Amino acid sequence: MEEFQGYLELNRSWQDDFLYPLILQESIYALVHNQDLGFNRSILLSKKKGYDXKYSLLVVKRLVIRMYQQNFVILSLNHSNKNAFFVPNKNLYSQRISEVFAVIAEIPVSMRVMSSLKGKERKQYKNLQSIHSIFPFLEDKFSRLNHVLDILIPHPVHPKILVQTIRYCVKDISCLHLLQLLLYEYCNNGITLKGSVSNFSKKKNQRFLLFLYNSYVCECESIFVFLRNQSSHLRSTSYGAFLARVYFYLKLEHFLKVFTKHCRVILQFFKDPFIHYIRYQGKWILASRGTFLLMTKFKYYFVNFWQCHFYLWLQTRRIYINKSLNQPIDFIGFRLSVRLNPSVVRSQMLENAFLIYNGIKKFETLVPTMSLIGSLAKEKFCNVLGHPISKPAWADLSDSDIIRRFGRMCRNLSHYYSGSSKKGGLYRIKYILRLSCARTLARKHKSTVRAFMKRLGSEFFEEFVFKEEKVISLILSRDSSISRRLYRGPIWYFDIFCIHDLASHND
């Protein structure tokens, strides 16, 4: 990638037309396929007797030409018997070129980001990359906010709108025409986060899909972030690379200097951001201290914004106004809500005594028990009512493998949902997995669950014990009552960077 960035630096005189020639370079295909993206690299290999496998520029050019043809017949390799045969595949050429396009289009975007960060010291905290790092912020902020907007990002997006969005960072006309061809080849119905994965064939065009989707979301966020920063006097400059086309940053700095010079008295009033904003996958969450009328105005602003700017018909029912999270919302596998804890204080002044009733808002993160039971029922660990059943698909494995797989699922769930306010739902899920494991083993040995568990004894449950329980009881405190109280509270971990399959075979 650095080689191609240097290539762009040396050719700034024709910087607007640099991308399309890169698509015909052999080395860019080698770069893409060496990144282990899951492709069948043999399609770009030139196989001849007496020669080693090499990436052929002629094959690359033919891929571009054959995209315009009606009959798609390719030469692929059968990995089972290594014999070549002809298989009709209409989309494979476009899949290869779309991945290369995504890699090339990321170059100018990354260069603009790096140029915007020059001269600025940015501390990188690895802990902030954890999924759990956002929940302490929610606990601190959301309990003091009045209203929350729960927004589903609208889709699908028309291909022409995507091309218009990407042209702000990719100015090569030829590449834009190629992008339009790829979009009409696959995405006649628009780009969605989930639906397009099937259109592009799973694990084959995810990079291209994410590039398109992130471009669309970035365009939405650019205008929203500008409005949000206005509420806090435009103090944020972290989105400079993506908002360069608006040319307002010089005005921003000038406005800030003038404001701090002449309006020092009311500067403190605006230090707290007016709106807190969180995005995860296809959902936005906006929280504010404003009134219900103000949040309603924001709701209809977003509706008009998507309809006028992206030509998307957004129904207002896709945006929910929740008053201080009285109704729980789903977010990153948790159920978020704010509960009012009443408290009574007795006060006495001379001979008069009176009671003061006060309510304290408490942010709660709950385990979505019903949705987890539905997932377990889908994978045949229990029925729809939550009653554990055996797992016949694992009955052929050894006893140690069966126990290890069930134990890994319990530990992963305990690790991820350790921050839940109430762990009753988590205990129920772990009970389902333990009993399902016991019934699977009893089914394998043609015995009863009671007899099998009596034979194994306590060794059976050791695999299901989460190690952090022992850490809390042994390290934090030796008092059993204190350790139990600490364990019932939320425990957030900063080493969860992605959510893997719970039944993953990798430790």
UniProtKB/Swiss-Prot annotation:
Highest taxon of the lineage: Eukaryota
Annotated protein name in UniProt: Maturase K
Keywords annotated in UniProt: Chloroplast, mRNA processing, Plastid, RNA-binding, tRNA processing
Principal location: plastid
GO molecular-function term, one example from the UniProt record: RNA binding
GO cellular component assignments: chloroplast
The family this protein is said to belong to: Belongs to the intron maturase 2 family. MatK subfamily.
Lineage: Eukaryota, Viridiplantae, Streptophyta, Embryophyta, Tracheophyta
General function of this protein: Usually encoded in the trnK tRNA gene intron. Probably assists in splicing its own and other chloroplast group II introns.
Source species of the chain: Fagopyrum esculentum subsp. ancestrale (Wild buckwheat)
Any matching Pfam family: Intron_maturas2
Cellular localization per UniProt: Plastid, Chloroplast
